[in-house]
UniProtKB/Swiss-Prot annotation:
Pathway(s): Cofactor biosynthesis; Fe-Mo cofactor biosynthesis
CDD domains cross-referenced by the UniProt entry: Nitrogenase_NifN_1 (cd01966)
GO molecular function: metal ion binding; nitrogenase activity
Pfam family, one: Oxidored_nitro
Keywords from the UniProt entry: Metal-binding, Nitrogen fixation
Organism: Rhodobacter capsulatus
PROSITE patterns: NITROGENASE_1_1
Name of the protein in question: Nitrogenase iron-molybdenum cofactor biosynthesis protein NifN
Function, in words: This protein may play a role in the biosynthesis of the prosthetic group of nitrogenase (FeMo cofactor).
Signal peptide interval: none
UniProt lineage: Bacteria, Pseudomonadati, Pseudomonadota, Alphaproteobacteria, Rhodobacterales
Chain residues that bind [7Fe-Mo-9S-C-homocitryl] cluster: C44
The family this protein is said to belong to: Belongs to the NifD/NifK/NifE/NifN family.
Gene Ontology biological-process entries: nitrogen fixation; protein-containing complex assembly
Keyword Protein transport appears in the UniProt entry: no
Amino acid sequence: MAVLTHSRRALSTNPLKTSAPLGAAMAYLGIEGAVPLFHGAQGCTAFGVVHLVRHFKEAVPLQTTAMNEVSTILGGGEQIEEAIDNIRKRANPKFIGIASTALTETRGEDIAGELRAMQVRRKDWVGTAVVHVITPDFEGGQQDGWAKAVEAIVAALVPVTAERDPDLRQVTLLVPSCFTTAEIDEAVRMIRAFGLSPIVLPDLSTSLDGHLSDDWSGHSLGGTRLDDIARIPRSAVTLAIGEQMRAAAPMIEDRALVPYRVFQSLTGLKVVDAFVRVLMELSGMQDPPPSTKRDRARMMDAALDAHFFTGGLRVAIGADPDLMFALSTALVSMGAEIVTAVTTTQNSALIEKMPCAEVILGDLGDVERGAGQAEAQILITHSHGRHAAAALHLPLVRAGFPIFDRIGAQDTCRIGYRGTRAFFFEIANAMQAIHHRPRPEDFGAAPIPQEFDHVPHPAPC
């Protein structure tokens, strides 16, 4: 059981955490025809847009209420109403997701109450779903903002149902913030292989997967349809991936009587096997499909090939709790050792389940310091960790958000049998790529072992 330790430094160096409003915005972008709206200053939104555009390499429709000195003091209700009007006129969205920021939450504004009054008064807003979530920058991180946004979407858009009328082939898939678009695709592929039809919430795999559109649009292109969210009560079960989705799943059960299963991770043999067993149970299959069996056999072979490099490997990792837990447990199952673990938020039950003695709530400065002291051999974190990797002369495996110095970050897959196989290869290849540079002390300057320290005598004739 890991112990959570708070970093006791007077400043943050090279931050690891991404803010909660940005996590909420990413969840909103997984809804079809959506426009995320930050209730705060223009700079908050501009900074978020830069992060999203650099990571996904796509245009992102992120809007702001543009709070100024006067509206911050007197209240920003008028700003919200004006922003929604402008967005509806210019982008014609089906969904507007509002995320508060540190500015408005520090003031203590009753955004939810103001929004309810607006929706009663503004009958012309009919046809545009508006959802609000409280996400101050100073509380939690990206994972927390994503989870709160999903919970708000469920509370606002999933109908309350008194009686069950399930479609036994339909399942609801709640995905975590750490899933890439390729990982959502892989989870959907695995579910469909068993003859099941998933409703993904939120679905970034069809909105931020990097596809060309014929026309420009001011809202998200793709994502979970509002009609599909309304059909969630007919699902046979809710499959929640990641500890961050543990609160949203029972909300669906309370509203629509849909049972749920929570999977803390989908990276590694045991957890994927457990996921497949549930899919077999839901589909009524006695054996997995041949393609699934083949994927499992390939993953097992990859584990055999990679264990020469992962056995005894000393790993330093910095990530959100769900991603940190998923990658760490998979590596420990391959014989690696987590010597440094730094995370972004304390709001996760997975922290104490980490396969290490200590988890630090800190930044990349803590990652660099801990990795150096523990003599780590590899570093796993997002692109901002490249400075620590260079300083320590360690290979860097980029994981998490943001990844801006590589193209195709959204196409990385580390879940399921296929993704776990790719992850093992990724780690092994990162270690193989380290080239040893000979130094003088490796040769003549090195001490000679005592058993070889002797004067040779000529052999008698």
